[in-house]
Amino acid sequence: MAVRRDSVWKYCWGVLMVLCRTAISKSIVLEPIYWNSSNSKFLPGQGLVLYPQIGDKLDIICPKVDSKTVGQYEYYKVYMVDKDQADRCTIKKENTPLLNCAKPDQDIKFTIKFQEFSPNLWGLEFQKNKDYYIISTSNGSLEGLDNQEGGVCQTRAMKILMKVGQDASSAGSTRNKDPTRRPELEAGTNGRSSTTSPFVKPNPGSSTDGNSAGHSGNNILGSEVALFAGIASGCIIFIVIIITLVVLLLKYRRRHRKHSPQHTTTLSLSTLATPKRSGNNNGSEPSDIIIPLRTADSVFCPHYEKVSGDYGHPVYIVQEMPPQSPANIYYKV
């Protein structure tokens, strides 16, 4: 029984590990987005539209300023908001910033993991076929870091629309078949990718057309993740059922062992009814003392006196005692 349980456990763990590795290998690390007004990917009136799938990762980076870069450092607080806030470019006091770009000497990065369930209490969770919005109401200066309305969201359309689990072709985009990327660059953007720092000049020989070649088949990623979740749930339910059956079996065996009859030495009724005689009792018969067996004194049945009827007929022990002559006998004449 124990060997069989061990083999079942090993089989379930092996299936879970294989499925986890398969799901991880299918996930995509999206190219990072540099949050700066120099990023030409933020289109006027539209912002940046992405089509991530469940399992993908996305980095939002506030680039640092050093001697090799051009321009000044821009201060931002980046928030995830609802559609109404994104349309009006406003935030609420209870909104928590995803990014606080206030350190010019280092890159500040926030990684978004597109997952339906987060192991972290404060982690982000996403649902398929739902839109999510990221904006910043700061104006780029240190004094306007804590603005709660307007800012670059309104003046430079620095906002991100993330259509999780959706296909770009179904949204009316015919120029890009990659569901995890927004449509191709508009004319006049000089081929600059959204993953390139706005402070670095683009390489004339580089091209972003090859990025979509390695991401074919991502439209079925959602179904594969759903299949993985279903198989994992089935394995967990199967393990719970096995554990429940084992516990019930142990309880049944313990109860059956507890109520099993004790093998005690009993005397027949004929032995109890026949008095025993001894050769040196001087003609007198021995006194037969019948003592009931008090199983309550035994360590095996401490509750015998309460449920003694459950153990069958009472058992008696006969103890022989030598006759005793009376010490003082008085006769009335």
UniProtKB/Swiss-Prot annotation:
Molecular functions (GO terms) = ephrin receptor binding; virus receptor activity
Q: Where is this motif: PDZ-binding?
A: 331-333
Q: Where is the composition biased (Polar residues)?
A: 190-213
Q: Which cysteines are joined by disulfide bonds?
A: 62-101, 89-153
Q: Which residues cross the membrane?
A: 230-250
Keyword field contains Cell membrane: yes
> From start to end residue, where is composition biased (Basic and acidic residues)?
175-185
The record ties this protein, via CDD domains, to: Ephrin-B_Ectodomain (cd10426)
Identify residues that carry Phosphothreonine.
Answer: 274
What does the entry list under GO cellular component? adherens junction; dendrite; focal adhesion; glutamatergic synapse; plasma membrane; postsynaptic density membrane; presynaptic membrane; Schaffer collateral - CA1 synapse
For this chain, the Swiss-Prot or TrEMBL PTM comment says: Inducible phosphorylation of tyrosine residues in the cytoplasmic domain.
The segments annotated as topological domain Extracellular are 28-229
**What keyword terms does UniProt attach to this protein?**
Angiogenesis, Cell junction, Cell membrane, Developmental protein, Differentiation, Disulfide bond, Glycoprotein, Host cell receptor for virus entry, Host-virus interaction, Membrane, Methylation, Neurogenesis, Phosphoprotein, Receptor, Signal, Transmembrane, Transmembrane helix
Role played: Cell surface transmembrane ligand for Eph receptors, a family of receptor tyrosine kinases which are crucial for migration, repulsion and adhesion during neuronal, vascular and epithelial development. Binds promiscuously Eph receptors residing on adjacent cells, leading to contact-dependent bidirectional signaling into neighboring cells. The signaling pathway downstream of the receptor is referred to as forward signaling while the signaling pathway downstream of the ephrin ligand is referred to as reverse signaling. Binds to receptor tyrosine kinase including EPHA4, EPHA3 and EPHB4. (Microbial infection) Acts as a receptor for Hendra virus and Nipah virus.
What is the name of the protein in this document?
Ephrin-B2
State the organism named in the record. Homo sapiens (Human)
